């Protein structure tokens, strides 16, 4: 699961419950170098659909999955 994203340096990043790496955000993927979307709880404890796959959008939709 992910917390709602916070602002860091103008970009939104969401920290996972386990606190390891970024959960959401452009170019950051759940501690696995992805885009921060689509990784399940088996990959660091983050939920699916943690953020939208748009690096330029303002809607990361980091919530509780």
UniProtKB/Swiss-Prot annotation:
Pfam families per UniProt: KRTAP (PF11759)
Superkingdom in the source lineage: Eukaryota
Bridged cysteine pairs (disulfide): none
Signal peptide: none
Purpose of the protein: In the hair cortex, hair keratin intermediate filaments are embedded in an interfilamentous matrix, consisting of hair keratin-associated proteins (KRTAP), which are essential for the formation of a rigid and resistant hair shaft through their extensive disulfide bond cross-linking with abundant cysteine residues of hair keratins. The matrix proteins include the high-sulfur and high-glycine-tyrosine keratins.
PANTHER family the UniProt entry points to: KERATIN-ASSOCIATED PROTEIN 20-2
Complexes and interactors: Interacts with hair keratins.
Protein name, as recorded: Keratin-associated protein 20-2
Encoding gene (name): KRTAP20-2
